[in-house]
Amino acid sequence: MAVKIRLKRMGQIRAPFYRIVVADSRNKRDGRSIEEIGLYNPMTDPSTIEVKSERVQYWLGVGAQPTEQVAALLKVTGDWQKFKGLPGAEGTYRVPTANTKPPRIPGGGAAKAVEAPAEAPAEAETPASES
């Protein structure tokens, strides 16, 4: 049985995301898979790549062949270099950090409204403690 590591298309029309799966090469693209080993979402900025590295190493070790697209993703995450014993096993993919800035609102009216209630309770406590 020839086993491939390939992309399984999911999502809606014009909004695809992919599961990285291990499947028999004779099965259809979106058909039955043996195991799901990752996710790839090209629609986010930057693209999201999640790979179960242990399972990828296992399947590559037992002879599963990645498709060209999956091989490119594995090179970005560093799993291909780790399997081949090449330098650069840390990969070039960086996990996107959470955006800590508050959303920018035109006019800034909502941002001021959020700050005003925070100041009001502090002022209300001061006169109460003086009495």
Curated annotation (Swiss-Prot):
InterPro entries: Ribosomal_bS16, Ribosomal_bS16_dom_sf. GO terms for biological process: translation. It holds the Pfam family Ribosomal_S16. The keyword Ribosomal protein applies. GO terms for molecular function: structural constituent of ribosome. The keyword Oxidoreductase does not apply. GO terms for cellular component: cytoplasm; small ribosomal subunit. Residues 111-131 have a biased composition (Low complexity). Residues 87-131 are annotated as: Disordered. Keywords: Ribonucleoprotein, Ribosomal protein. SUPFAM superfamilies: Ribosomal protein S16 (SSF54565). Belongs to the bacterial ribosomal protein bS16 family. This is Small ribosomal subunit protein bS16. It comes from Kineococcus radiotolerans (strain ATCC BAA-149 / DSM 14245 / SRS30216). The gene is rpsP.
